Structures are given as C-alpha cells and as structure tokens.
UniProtKB/Swiss-Prot annotation:
It comes from Arabidopsis thaliana. InterPro entries: CAF1P_plant, RNA-binding_CRM, YhbY-like_sf. PANTHER family: CRS2-ASSOCIATED FACTOR 1, CHLOROPLASTIC (PTHR46247:SF1). The lineage of its organism: Eukaryota, Viridiplantae, Streptophyta, Embryophyta, Tracheophyta. This is CRS2-associated factor 1, chloroplastic. One of its GO terms (biological process) is mRNA processing. Residues 68-136, 191-221, 471-532 are annotated as: Disordered. Disruption phenotype: Plants are albinos. Pfam families: CRS1_YhbY. SUPFAM superfamilies: YhbY-like. Required for the splicing of group IIB introns in chloroplasts. Forms splicing particles with CRS2. Interacts with RNA and confers intron specificity of the splicing particles.
Length: 701
C-alpha cells in the first residue's frame, strides 16, 4: 500500500554548507583579458533577423550584378542550366519568399503562358445600346423598357401595386444579365453557347409518330374540315376561329388529370413564366395553370394579363384552376422571345398602406374604430396558400350589415395579408384601418353606397307592374276538403280589421311602399352562384351539356325569377296573407308589434296536402345470450311504423299550423314485436321481454 503525501518526507537531512555553484571544482577557467580563447565571448552576437537581412541584401546585389554583366539575353537564355533555382527560404519563415519577385519552393508552378496566374483586370465593357433597358418609375410601379419589346417588362404582372413608388432602395439596373447592366458583374457568368446549334422546333413539321426517343407532341389545331395550319404572327390570327363547345370539352377533359401544369403562387404571373408557358405549349395545346395564394383574390386580372402578355385564350376556369388555349395556328418556332430575369429585383419603397389617421376620419374616430375592431367577429378565416375567389363578394355583403369588417389571417405570411388588404382597397373599395394581430380591419368609408338602394319615387305597391293573375280553368289549383274547411272557418277580413294595431299603425295593403319591393329586387339580384371548387370531369361535363342555342345571361334569368316572385307577392298581398312595411317602420319593436297583430287577424294560407313522405323507422335490438342449458337464443325486435306513409304535415301560410297525424297514430297503436323464425325448436327459451322478475331470478340461480 503506497502512502501519498502533499509534502515530501525528509529522509536525509540537508548539508550544512550548500554549494550554489554547479561547476565541478576541477574546471580550469581563463581570464578574458588578453586571452585568445575568450575572443568569441567578447564579440556581439547578431540576431537571426539581421543575418537574414544580410543574406537577402547580398543575393539582391548579386542578382543586379549578373543582370548588368549579361549583355546578350538570348545567348544567356540558350545556355544550359546546370541546376534549377530553388529558394532555400529563411530559417524563421521557410514558406516566405527570400527574394521578392522570385518563386519559392512552396509556390505553385506556372500553368503556362496562355493561362497567367495573375490575370489583368479588364474594365467593364459598356452594355449594348439595343439591349440596354430603360428603368422607369411609372404609375404601374417599376418597369423595364427595351427597344423592340412588345410591352414593358416587370417582375410580376399581376401583383405589382398600382401605386407610383416613392424611391428606389438601390441604384436602378436591369436584372437581365451582364449585357444589360450598368454596374460591375458580381454573379456567375453565363455558360458559353454550344458549338452545336440545336434544330429549331417547328410545330407544323412534327417528327414521325412512333419514333423512338421522342416525347409525344400534339398536332396543331383543332381545325375544321378543309382547313389547315397557317404561318401567321398576330394574336387574332394565331387564335383563329372561336372554339365550339365540343372542342372545349375535348380539350379540357384531356388536361383535367394531367400533372404537367404551371403553379402560380404569391408573386402571381412573373416575367420568367412567359417562357415557361411557351415551353408547355410546345407539346400540348392547352396549358393548365393552378393559382394559390394572393393572386386568387382577383382572378379576372390574372386571366386578363395572361391573354394580353402571352396570347392565347382562357377557355375554362373554376376556382383557382384555369386552362389556357394556345390557338389553332400556334407555332413554337415563331413564338415571341423574352429575355430571362436572372434574379428578383429589389422592390422599391411604396407609400404606407395604414395611415395613423385614415382619410375621412379623425384621430379619435380611428382609435375607437380600432378598439371596436378588436372585439368584432371575423367574417372568414383565410388559410395559407388558399383560394380567395369569393373574398371580395363576401366583404361587399358584410358591408351591407356593418361598417367595419374584420378578416382573420393568422398563420399567413406578413406580406401576403398586406397584399390582400391592398387588393381589397382597390376592388371593394374600402379604407384600411389596421393590420394588428394578423387581422385585416377595413372600413367601408364615407362615400359608401349600398347596392340595395331605394328609389326616390314612392307609390302603392306594384303600381307599375301589370301582371295577369287570372288562371285558366285547366290550371286552377284543386282545393282539398281540409283546405276548404280551413278557409271557411277563417273568412276574409275587411280593411277595418287590418287596422287593429295596438300601436296605431296602419296595416292595410294600400300603405305599402314600392321602394321596399324594389329593394327586394336588388337584393335578389345581388346573390351569386359562383362555385370555387376545383373542376372535375363530372362537373365540367355537366356545365357543358347545354343546348346549342345561345345561353341566357344571368341578368335575363334573374329578371324572370323576379317576375315570378312579384306575381306570388302580389297575390299574397291581395288575399290578405302577406304584409309589406314602409321604410319608416323598419324598427325592431315596430316590426315585432305589427307581426304579432297581423298573425292574430291574418287569413290562413294554402294547405299543402301532400307533404314529404317520412321513411319507415326500423329499430333493431342486438341479441342477448341466456345461460340456461347452454342454449343461445338470438332474438331481434323489429318495429316498423306502417302508418308513416299516412302521415302528412299541414302547413298553413299565415298561422303555421302543423299537424303530425302519423306520429299520433303510431303512439295509439304502439310498437309491434315480431320474432324471427328459427330453424330449430327452442321451447325452453322465452321471447325477449316476457320473463318476470321471479322467473328470471330462478334462471340466474
């Protein structure tokens, strides 16, 4: 076992006279004065840096002397070299060059005269005048104008704000490559052109069908009998004649399930997508474009920009998916060529969307509005990368009820819901109040006008409408006995009975204002039946299965529907089963009091004898096991209400009398039980629900 101590243990005692000189006593020492052996001790020793400096100086002087005494440089170059020069370096810095301007033994050899190590810096060549774009700050944002271009180029043609920028964040330049830039090139140079020129693709001269190694290509067209492709250049001639419904159905159904599509995101239609669409048109007649995010707020603008910038025709659209037809006479060889944007330019500085005091409000009103908006319920929740086709319509409908509208945008990117707010400001129009807590709060403004406006002229109800309410003998509705009995029990009321209002208001039909009817007409016209679901084959075929005649417009259809509604309303007012209030009587208390008074004196309405037939209710009860004699009996009780077909709902227009006869008859008869017929005879098994308590206790014991 070893013992470890912090201090050494003194085994031997130290000497009394220690010798501080380590030399041995037999060493002979000489005096330095006048002694030859002490010469090396008296000289001053030079440092290593001084020695290296002297070596460099001597070598530099020797090199200069050799250059001066060498008259014929060619002869000197022709002389064979005994040994190549190798720099020995210095002891302190072996990798450093001992002589400036000469190679070190650690330096890499020159690759050759054609590739010098230190390339001279070539000044930037001025850009070509023909390709140099002009950067413009216009009302449409930042644009680039190039000579010979069909239109002004932008980074995004659909999502660029329609507001003039205040200033640029950096010096203006075009992002189309080195030939169009006025600043030093900091990126990677483009690859040199291939020596082998590729054959230009001609859509009118397709390769033979079935050739190996070639992708499938659709023929140009479709063409009508006797018509073929033509080399044309204008947009109208490329499109050709309008497509028929059969042609549209065939083109769209062939692209519904394709995965070769163009995805459009928050930046909308960008400049480089122009070439991408032409690449998709190279092999197919129709390009499928799927839009998600901010660009779906205004799909009309997306379709307009596509047809204007690229050409083609949007033949079908459903929600965020649209199909762009290239044209009957489209040729990929004669397509327009667009320069490629090599990077996204920096966005300029735009005015603030949210003002501290919005236009038309005071500071106190704006503060109260923002405080009220925090407690307001949002009309919808916008998801990330969703389809917002109906957002503008929903906001307009919400403004009919409340002056403030709140939209929940939690989870979205900050720039996305700000772009949505800017679009709503122009499309609705409205005033942006706040973007607080990822919520869009908008105000309808002072100059807002309702779509349900009431005219100034007032008169009796349906004064200007002349409708023949007389029914022919064949079309007269048959009156059932129950209906005739109900009608005789409630005779028609005279005008004096209609005026029995507790508040003293007149309830006669003559006091109805025609403005209410026109307001109802406008409200019916404001409804829209647009669907935003993604197209399917069945839905598309259902939309296209219509007669060849020219379809009726939505205005004509709504006009016919409104006329039918007005006829029914006029008949109801004349028969005393309906009442229309004035605009001044739209207070909640007034409406309630008049409704109560009218319900007590109104005549009954028509009785609908044939209501909806109720389905027979079938109740099945699971089988139970009985442990008597190891026998298992499965019984099921089935209760079928046979009188369900006899039940009828009687609805009286004006008093709402509902009589459910089928349910009462079902309660009187009770439920009927029926056992299933067993293949075997189980005599000791009692039917379910017939055992008494004593018998059940005996069985369980």
């Amino acid at each position: 076992m070893s013992l470890k101590l912090n201090t050494p243990f003194p085994i031997f005692a130290p000497s009394l006279f220690p010798n501080h000189n380590p030399r041995a006593p037999s060493e002979i020492r000489f005096s330095r004065w006048g002694n030859a052996n002490a010469e090396r001790f008296e000289q001053r020793r030079r440092s290593q840096e001084e020695l290296e400096a002297e070596i460099r100086r001597d070598r530099r002087f020797d090199a200069a002397t050799k250059i001066v005494h060498t008259h014929d440089s060619e002869a000197a170059a022709a002389e064979p070299k005994t040994s190549p020069f190798r720099s020995r370096g210095t002891p302190s810095l072996p990798s450093a060059r001992s002589i400036p301007g000469r190679r070190s033994k650690y330096s890499k050899p020159d690759s050759g005269p054609n590739r010098p190590k230190n390339k001279p810096r070539v000044p930037d060549s001025p850009p070509q005048l023909d390709a140099k774009p002009e950067v413009k700050l216009s009302e449409d944002g930042l644009t680039y104008v190039i000579n010979g271009a069909p239109f002004e180029f932008k980074y995004s043609y659909t999502e660029t704000p329609k507001v003039k920028p205040l200033k640029l964040r950096e010096p203006a330049y075009a992002p189309f490559g080195p030939t169009t830039m006025g600043r030093p090139w900091t990126g990677r140079a483009p690859l040199p052109q291939s020596q082998k020129t590729p054959r230009e693709f001609d859509s009118f001269r397709l390769p033979p069908v079935g050739k190996k190694g070639l992708k499938p290509v659709q023929k140009p067209g479709p063409f009508r009998p006797g018509v073929g492709p033509r080399y044309v250049y204008s947009k109208e001639e490329i499109l050709g004649e309008p497509l028929t419904k059969e042609e549209v159905r065939e083109l769209v159904t062939s692209c519904l399930k394709t995965t070769r599509q163009l995805n459009m995101g928050r930046d909308g239609l960008t400049h480089n997508m122009l070439n991408n669409i032409h690449d998709l048109w190279k092999r197919r007649r129709v390009c499928k474009i799927k839009c998600k995010g901010v660009c779906t707020v205004d799909m009309d603008n997306v379709c307009e920009q596509l047809e204007e910038k690229i050409g083609g025709k949007v033949i079908y659209r459903r929600g965020g998916v649209l199909f762009l037809f290239r044209g009957r006479n489209y040729n990929h060889r004669t397509r327009p060529r667009f320069p490629l944007m090599l990077w996204k330019p920096v966005a300029p500085v735009y005015p603030r969307l949210i003002q501290q005091v919005p236009e038309g409000l005071t500071r106190q009103e704006a503060t109260n509005m923002r405080r009220k908006g925090r407690e307001l319920m949002p009309i919808c929740k916008l998801g990330k990368n969703g389809v917002y086709c109906d957002l503008v319509k929903n906001v307009k409908e919400a403004f009919e009820v409340c002056e403030l509208v709140r939209i929940d945008c939690q989870g979205m990117k900050g720039s996305d819901f700000r772009k949505i707010g800017a679009k709503l400001k122009d499309l609705v129009p409205c005033v942006l109040v706040s973007f607080e807590n990822e919520q869009i709060l908008i105000w309808r403004g002072r100059e807002w006008k309702s779509s349900l406006t009431t005219p100034d002229k007032k008169g009796d109800i349906l004064e200007d409408i002349e409708v023949d309410t007389a029914l022919p003998e064949d079309d007269e509705p048959s009156v059932s006995p129950n209906q005739s009995q109900t009608m005789t029990q409630n005779p028609p009321l005279d005008s004096m009975e209609l005026q029995n209002d507790p508040d003293g208001h007149d309830l006669s039909p003559s006091t109805v204002d025609s403005s209410e009817m026109e307001g109802t007409i406008n409200s019916l016209q404001s409804w829209s039946t647009k669907d935003v679901t993604e197209p399917t084959v069945d839905s598309f075929l259902r939309d296209l299965e219509e007669p060849e005649d020219e379809p009726e417009t939505s205005e004509e259809i709504s006009k016919q529907s409104i006329e039918r509604v007005l006829i029914l309303m006029k008949q109801a007012v004349e028969s005393g089963t309906a009442l229309v209030l004035d605009a001044a009587d739209l207070d909640a208390d007034t409406v309630f009091s008049k409704a109560v008074a009218f319900s007590s004196v109104a005549s009954p309405g028509p009785v609908f004898q044939h209501g909806l037939r109720k389905q027979p209710t079938v109740k099945k009860q699971e089988s139970q096991e009985f442990g008597y004699g190891d026998l298992e009996a499965k019984s099921s009780n089935v209760v079928v209400s046979r009188n369900a077909s006899k039940s009828s709902n009687v609805v009286v227009f004006g008093k709402r009398e509902v009589a459910e006869r089928g349910e009462r008859e079902e309660k009187e008869e009770g439920s009927k039980k029926k056992m299933d017929e067993f293949a075997e005879d189980y005599r000791e098994v009692m039917p379910h629900g017939t055992l008494k308590v004593d018998e059940l206790a005996k069985l369980l014991a």
